[in-house]
Amino acid sequence: MAVGSADNEFAVKLFRRLPRRYDLLAEVLSFGQNARWRAELVKHVAGAEPLQVLDVATGTAGVAIAIARSTDAHVTGVDVSEEMLEIGRARVAGAAMQTRIELKSARAEALPFGDGAFDAISFTYVLRYVSDPAATIAELARTLRPGGVMAGLDFYVPPSPPARAAWWLYTRAVLPVAGLVLGGRAWWDVGRFLGPNISGHYRRWPLARLLDAWEAAGIEGVEYRQMSLGGGIVMWGTKRA
C-alpha cells in the first residue's frame, strides 16, 4: 500500500499491524476473489512481455512473484511499509527469486526512478490512500516507457442496486466481525475502515474521473473490467508513444 497525505496516516498505522497474516486473511475475507483479481492484473502486465517491471504497493510481494513467474522480467517492488517488505523478502527468498525480484521502500507519489525506466507497471490498492490520485497516476506513468503497459487493481462499489446493497451489508456489518474472529483487533479495525473508505473514494473519484486521469497522464486505450459483481476493478492501458 502507498499512503502520502496526513489524512491517511491512520491507514499507514492500521496496515502496519497486519503483515504476518495479511495474505491469508485477505483471501478469506474477500471470499477468495483477491487471487482472481490479481490474476487478471498480472495477465495484462505479462501480455506485454516486459523486461523491467515496477510493482507499486507490492506489500508482501504476491503480485511481484506472480509477475516474475509469468514473465522473464526483473521486477522492482516498492511499498511504504517496511513490515510488509520484510515478509515480502522472505517470500521472494522462499520462491528462490532473489535475482529476479528487488524490493525497496518508496512512495507511489514520489518514485525514485528515472523517466521511462520500466516496460510495465502494476499497482494494487493505491489510489484510495494518496492525497491526489491524478498526480499519483501521472507519477507512475512518468516512469513508464512509451508503449509500455500500466495496470491497476482496487476494490470497487458494485454498480447494480442489489449487489451494492449486499456489498454495503457485508462491508459494514460482516467484514468487521469476520476480521475480529479470524485476525483479532487489528482486522476488526481494518474491517470498519475499508467500507467507508472505498465508498468515499468513489464519491470523490468516480470511474469517469479516474479514466480522465489515466488519459491525462498519457495512457491511451484505457480499459477496465469490473469483477465479482463489481466488488473489484482492474484497469489497464498503454503509454502514448
Predicted regions located by residue number:
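Class I SAM-dependent methyltransferase SAM/SAH-binding core
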Residues: 52-110
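N-terminal, positively charged/glycine-rich alpha-helical extensions of SAM-dependent methyltransferases
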Residues: 1-21, 182
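C-terminal alpha-helical "lid/dimerization" subdomain adjacent to the S-adenosyl-L-methionine
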Residues: 80, 157-213, 223
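A short acidic, Gly/Pro-enriched loop at the edge of an enzyme's catalytic core
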Residues: 109-121
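A short SAM/SAH-binding and catalytic strip from SAM-dependent methyltransferases
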Residues: 119-133
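Core SAM-dependent methyltransferase catalytic element
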Residues: 217-241
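A short glycine-rich, Lys/Arg-flanked "PGG" loop and its adjoining helix->strand segment in the class I
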Residues: 134-149
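Conserved alpha-helix/loop element of class I SAM-dependent methyltransferases that forms part
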Residues: 21, 30-51
